[in-house]
């Protein structure tokens, strides 16, 4: 009682009261990604942030930074590890510099449908990769979608690997993608996503490869004429928290954050699924020439890539992947 009176007197002298002391300090968490605000990543991130803020009564507040405002994916990963950034949505393949086994998500022509991939990443494959990320102080909350990647260029329609011969193609900065396009006969080179539009505009590259949603929302139709639906990779993405940030959230609020991450994973996937057909039509309206592709010769051309990388990922991880490919 005496302690309370003493504390009250001290607060009164400072012009405060016991009621002025917040029960829990609100936590603002920077969440960055490299895509445009019109992309499903950002729309889903907005829903995720709103749900978390409401359900934690403002105790946890995700502040969104789209369009590479916090840097490219490599920079954001570094920020997550050193503590300058709390959260991010990052293409899963971009985790390869800190854990090479994440390259398994980039193996060409792994999945025949998005639903097949969902089962793998929401199941044992995603759990195994999340465990590897945890060892690098990263908490993967959920597996989002980048979608099937397709090729655009300014030279002509791509119907067979021979059409890629010598084509200077921008690829993501990872060895797997470089090796894949080298096997297909192209002349690939890496470049950060934020520099891609201007590089295409200045004709530094003839071609690039991305999902339809990114091709459209990034306005690549302004600087590329041909779209070939190669579907060479189905790419996942991750909603990631730095482990030190996750540990600052109370167990009660962690449950809220995780539930919101699962909900908005499903919503983001729906956005991609619903929009892909629309994007083909929209890209045609913007003047792009679109062609379907017989995938068989492309699959044959990249078979050596699979053989080369199996030892890198190990029998256990490759075994899990193959189980889901066979329809487990």
Locations of regions flagged by a protein language model:
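Sec/Tat signal peptide C-region and signal peptidase I cleavage site
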Residues: 18-26
């Amino acid at each position: 009682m005496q302690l309370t009176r003493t504390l009250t007197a001290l607060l009164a002298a400072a012009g405060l009261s016991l009621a002025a002391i917040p029960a829990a300090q609100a936590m603002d968490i920077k969440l960055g990604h490299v895509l445009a605000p019109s992309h499903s990543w950002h729309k889903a991130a907005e829903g995720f942030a709103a749900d978390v803020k409401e359900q934690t009564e403002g105790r946890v507040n995700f502040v969104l930074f789209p369009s590479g405002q916090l840097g490219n994916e490599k920079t954001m990963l570094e920020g997550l590890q050193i503590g300058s950034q709390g959260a991010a949505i990052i293409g899963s393949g971009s985790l390869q510099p800190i854990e090479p086994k994440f390259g398994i998500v980039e193996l060409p022509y792994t999945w025949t449908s998005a639903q097949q991939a969902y089962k793998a990443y929401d199941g044992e494959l995603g759990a195994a990769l999340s465990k590897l990320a945890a060892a690098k102080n990263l908490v993967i909350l959920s597996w989002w979608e980048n979608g099937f990647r397709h090729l655009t260029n300014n030279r002509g329609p791509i119907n067979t690997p021979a059409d890629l011969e010598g084509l200077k193609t921008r690829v993501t900065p990872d060895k797997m993608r470089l090796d894949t396009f080298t096997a297909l006969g192209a002349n690939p080179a890496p470049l950060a996503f934020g520099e891609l539009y201007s590089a295409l505009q200045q004709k530094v590259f003839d071609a690039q490869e991305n999902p339809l949603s990114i091709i459209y929302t990034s306005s690549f139709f302004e600087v590329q004429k041909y779209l070939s639906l190669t579907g060479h990779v189905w790419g996942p993405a991750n909603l990631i928290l730095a482990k030190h940030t996750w540990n600052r959230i109370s167990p009660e609020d962690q449950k809220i954050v995780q539930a919101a991450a699962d909900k908005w994973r499903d919503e983001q996937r729906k956005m991609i699924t619903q929009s892909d057909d629309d994007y083909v039509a929209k890209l045609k309206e913007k003047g792009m020439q679109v062609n379907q592709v017989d995938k068989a010769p492309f699959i044959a051309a990249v078979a050596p890539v699979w053989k080369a990388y199996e030892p890198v990922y190990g029998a256990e991880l490759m075994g899990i992947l193959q189980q889901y490919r066979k329809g487990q």
